[in-house]
Amino acid sequence: MSKQSTSHLFMIEPEAFYSNEQTAFTNHYQEKVTDETPEIIAEKALAEFHALKNAIEERGIKVTSLKGSKDCPDHIFPNWFITFDDKTMQIFSMMAPNRRKEKKPSMIEHLTNTYELTDDMSYLEDKEVFLESTSSMVFDRVNRIVYAGISPRT
């Protein structure tokens, strides 16, 4: 496996999935679907989640998954934390109030059973300073470089 690849993924199983009005203005790819009910959209998201999880596992990659929350429409994109090979992790500040809710104590506890929390930048939210992990940064782990997009989330 490439040094840029991983052998272990963390996925959030969608409890809900809908356009997030709090983040839409900073996400070019997010669009509001009006021709399907929220229930149908959630069913499709859940089916896609299971198909993707199965495809990943069939290729020998370990998947750890936890259930999302109905009040967190973007929960399936867990941009609030990152883990590293040395078993450490960091928690990031999130711009949207409903994205901050994704940092469920139960999920943090689950992660800290395996990873040492070395930095929690949540305190920056009160100062309106945001750094949303993979929603605004791309990590080149081999060359130890981070590429960041110009965004209110970075």
Regions found by a protein language model. Give the residues of each.
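The feature marks the mature, well-folded catalytic cores of soluble enzymes
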Residues: 1-154
